[in-house]
Amino acid sequence: PYNHLFASGALDIIGFNYHDDWFMGVPTNFPGMPFIVTESVSGLMTRGYYRMPSDEPVVCPERWDRPYYDPSFSCSSYDNCRVPWGNHHEGTLKLVQNNDFISGQYIWTGFDYIGEPTPYGWPARSSYFGIVDLAGFPKDVYYMYQSQWTDKDVLHLFPHWNWEEGQDMDLWAYYNNADEVELFINGKSQG
């Protein structure tokens, strides 16, 4: 995006919030300038809540000025729910990792917080943005970041195993830093 302050050359580093579609214009519009994503992602999730199908993206609210409504007041933890101006965690992380001109990112947010209830209006009272919930428990996507930025072994399986008999769910052995993972359920390989 064009910005008089950026264009003046007065800054040693540039950055902007969200809008991953703008990232690729940085090397052309600001050649040689270090760039950091100053506020990124805005993925929405409720720890322990899984909406099927897991690969169906949800943008909510569809517009920032119209609160989203779902009677559960929950957002799926499959990293498939985001606000219109943001992206899913995995999507932005891939952009950062695959483009050398991006120095890094600040994720919005580390923790859920009271106030700015998004995507729901009243009676919701908090955000759903954090990779850690209000009680301090990591959400599933926390382990995605951990698997990318630590030397210790990481393998995170989800969702929980508290389903009703016959209820469909997608099991992910997705957040890991192993060369390969094979999942067995009751002695049978799932791949």
Language model feature labels by segment:
Residues 1-191:
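Extended substrate-binding grooves/exosites of carbohydrate-active enzymes
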